[in-house]
Amino acid sequence: MKSGRLFTRTCCLLGFLLSTACGSRTEKASPDYPEFKMIVRLWPDHHKDSALREELLQALKKYPDFCDEVWLCMEFETFSKEAHKESARAMAVAAERLRNAGIGVSIQGITLGHGDDFESGAARPHPELTWGNIVDARNVRTVTSSCPRQQAFHDYLGETYALYAGLCRPSCVWLDDDLRVTYHAPARQLCFCDTCLSLFNRQHGEHWTRETLVEALDRNEGEGRLRRQWISFCQQSLAEVARTVARAVHEVSPGTRMGLQHANFHRELMEGRDWNPTLDALEEETGLAPASRPGNGFYDDHAPRGMLLKGYDMARQIRRLKPSVREIAAEVEGYRHRATGKSPHGLCVESMFYLAMGATQLSYAIICAASEPMQWYADNYFKSLSAWRPFYEQYVAFNRGTEPGGIDPYIGPDHALRDTEAGEPSLAWIATGAGDMIYDMATLGLPFCPDGNHSSALIMDASAVQGLARD
């Protein structure tokens, strides 16, 4: 299925990188550190299908060292209130069974929607979706993804999340990484609908249309002022969605924390520099420090070096978190969760690398689609990860107060404000590949620390230098 020789070389390389990852120690003010957890992420069938639920419980009991907590999943292919009510009732039953087995319970759910070709499997309209959809800069409109500034959408989210949280009383409610500015297919970015344009104009005393706003953003109107305003507006659009959910959850389950699943989207400059506006909203509404789940991509290990890209990207996202965000549950993903996707040993090595990059916990999306029999998942994935757990626990304890050391592939904080060059297409400034050369260089054994606070040197390619003009 894969080259054993290549995978062995990759594991040896990771061993060297891990040995350098703890080179910089940063003692933190508080002696309190989050509890190490190994978490299993699920999909709705794991609580709705009683047979599958029982198979999962038996598998977790067979390997008790593997899993501390599960994330039960809200419905993501419907806006129907009745469908959500039925699912929430089944989820409450599953939550009780899991807690009785000594396993913690949290919940994850979507907000805006990943895109027309993701949740529903087809770009078909939902009759219950009565509010506005996302419209991008090219006037491309989604069918199933929601504009974040629609009041009816906020009402729906608050009611739906409160339903699940009230019945299940989860430890944490996690917002999926569809709460983002870019890539809600077919829309490239959000949101240039009439509602968003009207609110943006009112906020800044302007009269932009979609066309004139895009033109002004491209020519960098106000020497970066307009881009800053638009990026901030988009970030606040997401933050208000998070605020609505957090407020609704907190009202029915005051002890429930909030968490944000965020992709490694530092290349997408319209996302903003970090996720702090959203994380701040979660904390303001609950009074509790939010949790982070960084990471995306590397869905199979057919090309094992892909974990370097994901891990180093994750390191950059982790460095940009506020110190108060201490629970950092790295994504270990195997979509579509087939035996031919990732090997058990590959999962173990991948998990170790993400801990070295600064994660404090591990979240596994490796059985969601139930593509294999539960017994196969248990006797391969659960068994192998259980065997590695003592090593993970020792490493996390040793790694406290450290961060990756080495060379920082620097990306300036104002990269989004660079002037576009002749011949570049519209909105070329919203994305960058700056620093991507390190993924090949890392295979030589060079240690890197993206956004590191104690780097031994900086390295920049031409794209990174282009973004320095306004630093």
Language model features: what each stretch is:
Residues 40-49, 75-86, 139-155, 223-239, ...:
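The substrate-binding groove and active-site-proximal loops of carbohydrate-active enzymes
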Residues 21-110, 142-144, 151, 155, ...:
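Mature N-terminal, pre-catalytic/accessory segment of carbohydrate-active enzymes
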Residues 426-471:
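Helical hinge/lid and interdomain linker segments adjacent to catalytic or ligand-binding clefts
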